[in-house]
Every structure is written in C-alpha cells, then in structure tokens.
C-alpha cells in the first residue's frame, strides 16, 4: 500500500492491492485482473454454473455467461421468434446477483442466433444484466459453436428456434433413416458472425440504447 515501507513484516501477500478496472466511460472495478472463460450452453457449464458464479462474485472478477443459453434452454418460451422467458438464464443471473459484492460484473455473450432471438434485450431489460459481449467466433477459432443432439425431437426444437441442424431433422428421408437406426444423432451449429466497423458501432449503440452499461 502507498506510504508503507516494504520489509519482511509488511510485504505480505494479503497486503498486496490487486484491484484494477476496465472500460472507457463506464468502468468495471475488479479485485483481481481476471475473467472466467465463457460458460455457455454446454452441459458441464450448466451443472457447474453455481460454483463459478459464486466464486466470481465473491472474488470480485468478471464472469462470462456464454452463447446459446436461451436458445438451448428446453423450457424457454418464445413469441414471434423472440425470447420471452428462459428459466436457465434467469437462474444463472440470479445466482450471480445474490452473491455480487460490487466488484466485477456479469457479461452475457450474444452470437448471431442470440441476437436474432432477442437475448440481449431479455438479459438487460428483464433480468438486470449490465454487460453484453458481442460474439463473433470462438476466440482463435473463427467458427460457430457446435453441440451434439441425441434425439430428433431436440433437433427439431432447435431448428425451429433458428439454429443450423445437420442432418436436417425436417427432411422425411432423414426422419426415416433415424427411425431405422441409420442416423443416431444430430449436430447444432451456430452461425459465424460477420463484422465491419460500421455494423460494430451500430450494434454497440443499439445495446447501449436498451440499457447495457458495458
């Protein structure tokens, strides 16, 4: 700390100030300069969310809720192609908010499908989320997210929600092959976000308008 002479008695690790902040006009204070990885729609993220969320909240770091959480929520409700209710996203946000202590924040990712489904609006306006991360790819891998789907019913549900599903579960030949055991599973793919400076600035302005701070 400022004004303290460093010696063997004062230079102890609990005395070190690791606080930092990021942002431009509105800054996020953090106790440690750390972000979690994005915990999205995977089963392992769903099962372990509470541990990550509580840990991030009390540690004062930034927690990232990954893409496709609403779209993959089997109990989600939609109206005119827009998310109206997602028990899974609501659960995740509440766990973090219940333990939040003023440092860090919760960022919700929004990829192409999330944006089309109105996830940013739902997260900010209905759940009180303050930060949205615009998602274009998978970090160094500029591809969309992928998951396996074990049933044709799940494949049909996600295709109707706007996802790319292969093979096409609405194709009669695919349905017949599935019945005969020739096709045992399906794949859900997220679209690759494309960006240029103009569209990026326009989307940032839109997110700020709906109430996102970060």
Q: Where are the model-predicted features located?
A:
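Long alpha-helical, hydrophobic tracts
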Residues: 36, 40-47, 58-60, 204, ...
């Amino acid at each position: 700390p400022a004004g303290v002479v460093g010696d063997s008695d004062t230079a102890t690790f609990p005395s070190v100030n690791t606080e930092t902040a990021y942002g431009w006009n509105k800054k996020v204070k953090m106790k440690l300069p750390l972000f979690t990885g994005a915990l999205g729609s995977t089963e392992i993220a769903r099962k372990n969310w509470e541990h990550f969320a509580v840990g991030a909240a009390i540690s004062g770091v930034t927690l990232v809720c990954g893409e496709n959480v609403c779209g993959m929520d089997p109990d989600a409700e939609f109206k005119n192609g827009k998310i109206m209710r997602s028990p899974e996203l609501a659960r995740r946000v509440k766990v973090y908010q219940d333990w939040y202590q003023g440092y860090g924040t919760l960022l919700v990712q929004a990829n192409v499908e999330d944006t089309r489904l109105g996830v940013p609006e739902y997260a900010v306006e209905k759940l009180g989320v303050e930060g949205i991360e615009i998602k274009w790819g998978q970090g160094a891998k500029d591809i969309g997210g992928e998951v396996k789907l074990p049933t044709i019913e799940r494949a049909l549900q996600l295709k109707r929600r706007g996802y790319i599903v292969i093979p096409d579960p609405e194709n009669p030949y695919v349905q017949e092959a599935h019945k005969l055991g020739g096709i045992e599973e399906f794949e859900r793919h997220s679209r690759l976000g494309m960006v240029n400076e103009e569209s990026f600035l326009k989307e940032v302005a839109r997110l700020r308008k709906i109430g996102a701070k970060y």
